[in-house]
Amino acid sequence: MKFRSLIKKTSNWLTATPERSLDNAYKAALKIKEIEDNHFGGKKVSKENADYGDSVISYFKTEVNGYLQKINMGLGVFKTSRLFLNISNIQELPQERPTERELQKNATTAAIIFEKLEFIDQVASKYQSRDTQEVYNGSLVLAKESSQDKETQTLDNKSTNQTNSKLSNNNKISSGQNDSRLESASQKTGVLPRSFINTLNKIKQEIDPKSGESEEQVLNKYRKSRLRTALSIKFILLLIIVPLLTHQLTKTFLLTPIIHQYFQNHEQVVFINKDLEEEAFEELSHYEEILRFQGLIGLREPLTDEEVEEKVQEKAREITEEYRAQGIDSIGNVFADLFSVTAFAIVIVSSRKEIEVLKSFLDEILYGLSDPAKAFLIILFTDMFVGFHSPHGWEVILEGVARHFGLPENQEFNFLFIATFPVILDTVLKYWIFRYLNRISPSAVATYKNMNE
């Protein structure tokens, strides 16, 4: 009874998650609206709409930013939980036609949700839409320029100068001109090291006579970089949390009860493959041998054959329940992983702009590393997955995957996989080093060769 009560409470809490998270976001929007009405005449919280000092404006902006973060988190939880509940409700279609009262209740609930979402969008759009759109546009410009650079790069200095002049003209038009010029430099080929060129660019900016414009550009660059980092981290967490949460919810509340009911209706089904059956027989035989051995050496009173058989039967029941539960868990993992992959694909397909932002964020981090750091990461990756000791690691991974899905271990497949996949991976890595890294950072390749030798 306690377990059923706990399951019911958990189910009710999960069902109420969308409404609860939307209410939190709505309350945060009300707080922002209250600050606007009481101190800024119902307008946006900014210095232009009030006669306060810098300290007061900074205080109100800090409050508004805190409420905006609550709104973003609440809406994120609202969308994610609604997606999970919709997936779960597909399996629970009503058998009878809903009554007029139920339809009216659903319509009222939907109207309230729409009203709250509209109010939240009306309040939050004053503070988020412009900056977010600038980050999206800047990331798209970076992606386009990066692809153009990769297509037009040559070792000839004349071609390099033409590419640089073309990029500088495009940067005058785009809003993120300095960001694009500095970040795309990591993807160009030049005679001088990239770090030396970046240092010269920084000195050039610092001695620029248009100091006021440069300061404004630095502030805009910092704001865009901060927002891009926040969006990238949020998207990475979403890519991790959504599949994991989908796996746990579908497995716990949808798949496990169905599979458990099937095993109850088919009591003759105990093992889902021969390997588990052999493990169970070995465990039972080992238990019987322990009982007889302990009786022979005096660790316990000698047991008669009837007593030994009784204890072995009890152990056999325990083993049956244990391996039946293991089979239920393995079958549930197969279908739960399919749901997780589907959820992951939905997030990827519906987040094109976020992917562009994440790509520019990762490029900035990876290509901004020092040459020894790049060489260290390459050596660590190669030694771990394609090195001398990698076959042992791949064996452990393959055994874990087989046990996760309840599949029997196949030594021939394991040997074939270990003999081919690391070789393919090593070939792809060497091609990447030769094709891209050798042009982007030749010193990193030289450092990698020296460290590898």
Swiss-Prot record:
One Pfam family, short name: CemA
Keyword field: Cell inner membrane, Cell membrane, Hydrogen ion transport, Ion transport, Membrane, Transmembrane, Transmembrane helix, Transport
Biased composition (Low complexity): 164-175
Region (Disordered): 147-189
Membrane topology: Multi-pass membrane protein
The keyword Transmembrane helix is annotated on this UniProt entry: yes
GO molecular function: proton transmembrane transporter activity
Annotated Polar residues bias: 154-163, 176-189
Cellular component aspect of the GO annotation: plasma membrane
Listed transmembrane segments: 235-255, 330-350, 377-397, 413-433
Subcellular location, record wording: Cell inner membrane
InterPro entries per record: CemA
Function: Required for H(+) efflux immediately after light irradiation to form a rapid H(+) concentration gradient across the thylakoid membranes. Together with PxcL, contributes to transient H(+) uptake following dark to light transition.
Family that this chain belongs to: Belongs to the CemA family.
Protein name: Proton extrusion protein PxcA
Gene name as annotated: pxcA
